[in-house]
């Protein structure tokens, strides 16, 4: 699985066991991504942070 880094023109290959790509955004009107990468379990959203997870190459 290949996941985008913070700047989507760059990506990395995920290590074994991390089979989801994620995008973390501050929960505001703009929803600008502040972090991207590989993860094994999609975190729950909170009042301040929203996560979007997916399982295909460079989907984040």
UniProtKB/Swiss-Prot annotation:
InterPro entries: Cytotoxin_Cobra, Snake_3FTx, Snake_toxin-like_sf, Snake_toxin_con_site, Toxin_cobra-type. GO terms for molecular function: toxin activity. The keyword Hydrolase does not apply. Expressed by the venom gland. Disulfide bonds join 3-21, 14-38, 42-53, 54-59. Monomer in solution; Homodimer and oligomer in the presence of negatively charged lipids forming a pore with a size ranging between 20 and 30 Angstroms. This is Cytotoxin 4. It comes from Naja mossambica (Mozambique spitting cobra). The lineage of its organism: Eukaryota, Metazoa, Chordata, Craniata, Vertebrata.
